[in-house]
Amino acid sequence: MHPSTFVTTIACLAGLAHGYANPGSCSGACNIHDPALIRRQSDGKYFRFSTGNKISYASSSSIKGPWTVLGSVLPRGSSINLPGKTDLWAPDISLVNGAYHLYYSVSAFGSQDSAIGLATSATMDPNSWTDHGSTGIRSSSSKPYNAIDANLFHDGGNYYMTFGSFWHDIYQAPMNSAATAVSSGPYNIAYNPSGTHAVEGAFMYKFGKYYYLFFSSGICCGYDTSRPAAGKEYKIRVCRSTSATGHFVDKHGVSCTNGGGTVVLESHGHVYGPGGQGVFTDPALGPVLYYHYVDTRIGYADGQKRFGWNKIDFSSGWPVV
């Protein structure tokens, strides 16, 4: 066998071994953490939001880029009076009744004193955002959950907020008809009873008859100074249900409230610790899983994390990338 053919064959076999496609291309501003993605209704422009710089955001004509940074959603920080009000996390973006709703987290790393806030804009243009403060979803040490990592889901006229990180993991709460405030108490929809309960960053998406609950599990951050044991780093998992409010199970029928979760994407090749995900219906590509990841060819620091995306195949009833 010619040496070049041998190398190509080995590369192909390696690709089959991990089974995951490499991230789609990204140009322009591609360093990002906790991305949130939407396409503006009026002109089809893409907007991408992320943790840092009081919710940094960028725009592009395509999911591939080139991404151009526009600035901060809330340059003065949040009106929510909690530590971390000028260090906002984990944005989530939705179009609600003709306005763009940007949900954000106010907290300090490792703290349970947290809240989910809301900012709105009619256009998403720079300097067009209005902060509305808390949605009423808050947590403290007396609660079984941590009120961060919001995701709004709309189903048949009803809005639900899914949120949570560690502690008792993922909760869901009904929202009012304007999706501005919680309307009743939260309930648990995902929990890993083992270890440190390392589950967070949930995102709901409906395809066909199923509601899919995507979430990140494992250790998210600080890889440059303290690398977790192999397999303990971030990865993306999923459970599904025929109802927006549960009961979610994984591919083997294990309940998501009892440690269930089928792996959708994990470390492979030069991709390490993918997570902080969402799902977006692209007009050209169809369903797309987007996320952040470490490119091991570049570096492991949090500030070096990259924007990744892959097309999703739901033909088996489970998301495959």
UniProtKB/Swiss-Prot annotation:
Pathway: Glycan metabolism; L-arabinan degradation. It is found in: Secreted. Residues 1-19 form the signal peptide. Its EC number is 3.2.1.99. Transmembrane segments: none annotated. One of its GO terms (molecular function) is arabinan endo-1,5-alpha-L-arabinosidase activity. The active site is at D34, E200. It catalyses: Endohydrolysis of (1->5)-alpha-arabinofuranosidic linkages in (1->5)-arabinans. The record marks D149 as: Important for catalytic activity, responsible for pKa modulation of the active site Glu and correct orientation of both the proton donor and substrate. It is an enzyme of class 3 (hydrolase). It holds the Pfam family Glyco_hydro_43. Keywords: Carbohydrate metabolism, Glycosidase, Hydrolase, Polysaccharide degradation, Secreted, Signal, Xylan degradation. Its main location: secreted. One of its GO terms (biological process) is arabinan catabolic process. Gene3D superfamilies: Glycosyl hydrolase domain, family 43. GO terms for cellular component: extracellular region. Belongs to the glycosyl hydrolase 43 family. PANTHER family: ARABINAN ENDO-1,5-ALPHA-L-ARABINOSIDASE (PTHR43301), ARABINAN ENDO-1,5-ALPHA-L-ARABINOSIDASE A-RELATED (PTHR43301:SF3). Endo-1,5-alpha-L-arabinanase involved in degradation of pectin. Its preferred substrate is linear 1,5-alpha-L-arabinan. This is Probable arabinan endo-1,5-alpha-L-arabinosidase A. The lineage of its organism: Eukaryota, Fungi, Dikarya, Ascomycota, Pezizomycotina. The gene is abnA.
